[in-house]
């Protein structure tokens, strides 16, 4: 497998709809000239934006967190340009971008250092071959203070790895009917 460059990312987004909406360059300032956490195409990746919908974890019901039987009441829904994550807690969000991953590509998501250096960690499982949807993002606030994340700005970087022609996967995410196929919005755990 080889990592793919900005030229390949641009071609796949513009000609095959791999990333929608797609930004061909790096955006570092908003229309008013204010600094942003950058997003868009980089040399060997694509920096995704966080949408305006968030689910912030709360322990109001003193429930046990169980991935097989997850209680939706464990979250407070927030819609806005920013989200405050309580200390030692987490929030879910989604990308602005909708992805359509080709059959011969595996995509890995890494958090942006701007957030990591503030103790905010982004976790996303790999985007498997032929998966499509909005990416659900998990933000962990590892600090003892409230932490802020911004909608419409860069939060993580996607890296695209393409397999050799003779090593394309036998069964894709779509082939096996993956439970998160085509997800839109912030998606909670499914079993």
From Swiss-Prot:
SUPFAM superfamilies: dUTPase-like. Pathway: Pyrimidine metabolism; dUMP biosynthesis; dUMP from dCTP (dUTP route): step 1/2. Its EC number is 3.5.4.13. GO terms for molecular function: dCTP deaminase activity; nucleotide binding. The keyword Hydrolase applies. It holds the Pfam family DCD. Keywords: Hydrolase, Nucleotide metabolism, Nucleotide-binding. Catalyzes the deamination of dCTP to dUTP. This is dCTP deaminase. It comes from Psychrobacter sp. (strain PRwf-1).
């Amino acid at each position: 497998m080889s990592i793919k460059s900005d030229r390949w990312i641009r071609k796949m987004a513009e000609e095959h709809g791999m990333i929608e909406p797609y930004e061909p360059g790096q955006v570092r300032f908003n229309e008013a000239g204010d600094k942003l956490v950058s997003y868009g195409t980089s040399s060997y990746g694509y920096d995704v934006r966080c949408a305006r919908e968030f689910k912030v974890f709360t322990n109001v019901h003193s429930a046990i967190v169980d991935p097989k039987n997850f209680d939706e009441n464990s979250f407070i829904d927030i819609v806005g340009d920013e989200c405050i994550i309580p200390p030692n807690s987490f929030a879910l969000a989604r990308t602005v971008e909708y992805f359509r991953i080709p059959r011969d590509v595996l995509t890995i998501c890494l958090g942006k250092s701007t957030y990591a250096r503030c103790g905010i960690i982004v976790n996303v499982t790999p985007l498997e071959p032929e998966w499509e949807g909005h990416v659900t993002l998990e933000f962990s606030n590892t600090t003892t203070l409230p932490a802020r994340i911004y909608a419409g700005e860069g939060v993580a970087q996607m890296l695209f790895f393409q397999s050799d022609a003779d090593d394309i996967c036998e069964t894709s995410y779509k082939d096996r009917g993956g439970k998160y196929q085509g997800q839109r919005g912030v998606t909670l755990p499914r079993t």
